[in-house]
Amino acid sequence: SRRQRQMCIRDSRITDAKASKGETVLKKVLESDEGARRLGEVALVPNSSPISNSGLLFYNTLFDENAASHIALGQCYSKCFKGEKNLSASEISERGGNSSMIHIDWMIGSGEIDIDGFGKNGEIVPIFRKGEWVD
């Protein structure tokens, strides 16, 4: 059976979290520091990606996470800011990034996942349907 997780995010902060297994651990992780309650990474990967279709397990998170959509709680990657490499925590924050002592990835992708965003006027905008990008 799949483990179920739910997070309520308001004003870019996780305000509530539930898990069918490991909820106590999840809540302790969220209490690590203020940045632990914010997303540090969101990666949308279609279920049909070559790595996903390979069926291989590399036993290395940096490779395996690319087989599925995933999110990370905590620290963002400062190298993702255009033209920047070694930013301080305050510089990361000034650019809208998140600082934390943790960075915990978890895979959320599958051929069943639907992902929606919200437009400027609050309308729901489909992004993924059944694990694939919406055209």
How should each PLM-predicted stretch be described?
Residues 15-85:
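Dual-mode signal for accessory low-complexity, basic/Gly-rich regions
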Residues 4, 68, 112:
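Broad gene-expression machinery/nucleic-acid interaction feature
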Residues 1-8:
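Single conserved hydrophobic/aromatic residue that forms the stacking wall/gate
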Residues 6, 32-34, 60-63, 105-108, ...:
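A general structural signal for short secondary-structure junctions and capping/turn motifs
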Residues 93-135:
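Extended hydrophobic packing segments that form well-structured cores
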